[in-house]
Design a protein with these regions (language model features):
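Glycine-rich phosphate-binding loop of ATP-dependent small-molecule kinases
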Residues: 1-262
Length: 262
């Protein structure tokens, strides 16, 4: 039996508590010079964007950096497949979140015919070694697959069609992916079989309930990265210096102001 979906107030209370901890994690990552990669994969409409927004809502974009690469350029198509992702990897004190990642090759590219079966198979063969190299370079890698049901995906796609506030979310691959449900399922299973390793495991997140999925992901991230409290010096707000004071409000007279409509 499905659990009752979380109500707004209960969700916001839990979310805020987890976001406070994410701010502590952020300070620790910066203080210790850690390098973290968190990647999100899943079918279209699985809730990747909303989950990433919940993570980044109250943290610094200088520490948490979101990467959502467009389709490769003609030049990038001639490069090693993971090359454009390597350029986005974190330096010390950074957490990089991939909204889709190098696993595009195992999913959307393969299913929609943007790569050959041979290219997909070669990717699945070499990617565990690539991820092992990331670990050996000091990067902590977390891989999440958001699993949405056929019924829920249909509801979300229909909302993208009908709701003007969501129509921008409807991509060129959404509708074709809808007709290829089982092809995506087989591609997912092949990806797991080849790349769900002991060193770099996949974590599956049921995402029909968006709110619970977001909370579960945030909680899991905090459990996967040990962090402590960073000592902070007591800060005293300084007074405004009156040296060279002048009427700075009067100096704005005659400038263009945004109309105070509200």
């Amino acid at each position: 039996m499905a659990r009752e979906k979380l109500k707004g107030k209960a969700y916001q209370k839990e979310l805020l508590a987890l976001q406070v901890e994410l701010c502590k994690l952020q300070a620790w990552v910066k203080h210790e010079g850690l390098k973290v990669v968190i990647l999100f994969e899943g079918r279209d409409g699985a809730g990747k964007g909303g989950t990433i927004k919940a993570i980044t809502e109250r943290v610094s974009p200088r520490v948490f950096r979101v990467v959502a690469l467009p389709a490769p350029s003609d030049r990038e198509k001639t490069q090693m497949f993971v090359q454009r992702y390597i350029a986005q990897l974190p330096a010390a004190g950074e957490i990089v979140i991939f909204d889709r990642s190098w696993y595009n090759r195992a999913g959307v590219e393969y299913v929609l015919g943007f790569c050959t079966p041979k290219q997909r198979d070669r990717f699945l063969e070499v990617v565990p070694g690539f991820e092992k190299a990331l670990l050996e370079s000091g990067i902590l890698l977390l891989k999440y697959w958001l699993e949405v049901s056929n019924e829920e995906q249909g509801k979300r796609f229909q909302a993208r069609i009908d709701d003007p506030l969501r129509q921008w979310k409807l991509s060129k691959t959404d509708l074709p992916s809808r007709t290829k449900w089982y092809e995506y399922s087989r591609a997912r299973d092949a990806m797991f079989a080849a790349t769900d390793t002991r060193q770099c495991p996949w974590y599956v997140v049921p995402s029909d309930d968006k709110k619970r999925a977001r909370l579960n992901v945030l909680h899991h991230i905090l459990k996967q990265i040990p962090y402590g409290r960073v000592p902070r010096e007591k800060v005293k707000l300084p007074d405004r210096s009156k040296k060279n004071a002048y009427d700075d409000r009067a100096s704005l007279k005659g400038r263009r102001f945004v109309p105070a409509k509200y």
